[in-house]
Amino acid sequence: MGNCLHQAELSPSTENSSQLNLEDLWNFSYNGNDSFPEIDYDASLAAAAPCHSCSLLNDSSLPFFILASDLGILASSTVLFMLFRPLFRWQLCPGWPVLAQLAVGSALFSIVVPILAPGLGNTHSSALCSLGYCVWYGSAFAQALLLGCHASLGPKLGAGQVPGLTLGLPVGLWGATALLTLPITLASGASDGLCTPIYSTELEALQATHAVACFAIFVLLPLGLFGAKGLKKALGMGPGPWMNILWVWFIFWWPHGLVLGLDFLVGSKLSLLPTCLAQQVLDLLLNLAEALAIVHCVATPLLLALFCHQTTRTLLPSLPLPERWSSPVDTLGSKS
């Protein structure tokens, strides 16, 4: 929204010279010796300059993008290896195929982080930027929807009680994700060597659709899960959505969905900010929300590892003796 232009610093004398004194105008007389008050038009133009706002995620933040990408790829790859490792106890996690897809989504996000990072000069092209935004938001949408399904289905994921889950759920979720990413894919590109969404009247409908999608998935979805959990518990209708450590994921994206929606309202003139300071605060919140969203690619594999460790530690001792004999851990021990 705001720009990072050099803002002229006005001295008190300059500020006073840019305003007409009402008393001087009242006492003004049209004598030959009188002259019109001098107005500093340069100062007036400087005062009317756009609101000054510099981005936190500028060229100097490139190491942050690179570090987050590297750590995210490493952590996601490790979790995927442990989930697909033959005869390993993490395959006892309820719905471990869904967990594997979460790790894949986190890895995809980590891969495209450097593409959208500032400070890479003029290496960006519009096609590459559009692809980057497509994968960026597509992986985030997919992870949010997978978490919603994982919370709603709960332990049924590991009991084979959901027919068609193995193929139907991934196809449906990733297909919906592809549709949700179309607006930002078409409304993004490269500008001055930076990947950025394109704001124009022709693309306003696409930007509105993207803002609504982010608000619904990142803000309303977790609120709906919490509301359903509390309502079912209050009415005694059952346990409700399965609450676990994976819900922490929404903390990294909830601010982004909220602030992005507010920024669209301001940019489309549907809501006006009263002062320049309010605009600067909004720009700062946008940068902080984006940085927090980037950190999720490192946190998600850690959350998955913690969840698998907790569930397998509590699940394995509770299994009946014949099932424990056929579990991957015991099979691995017998082979060794």
Curated annotation (Swiss-Prot):
It is a multi-pass membrane protein. Residues 85-95, 154-166, 229-244, 309-336 are cytoplasmic. CDD domains: 7tmA_ACKR1_DARC (cd15010). GO terms for cellular component: early endosome; membrane; recycling endosome. The chain crosses the membrane at residues 64-84, 96-116, 130-153, 167-187, 208-228, 245-265, 288-308. GO terms for molecular function: C-C chemokine binding; G protein-coupled receptor activity. It comes from the Eukaryota. This is Atypical chemokine receptor 1. It comes from Saimiri boliviensis boliviensis (Bolivian squirrel monkey). The lineage of its organism: Eukaryota, Metazoa, Chordata, Craniata, Vertebrata.
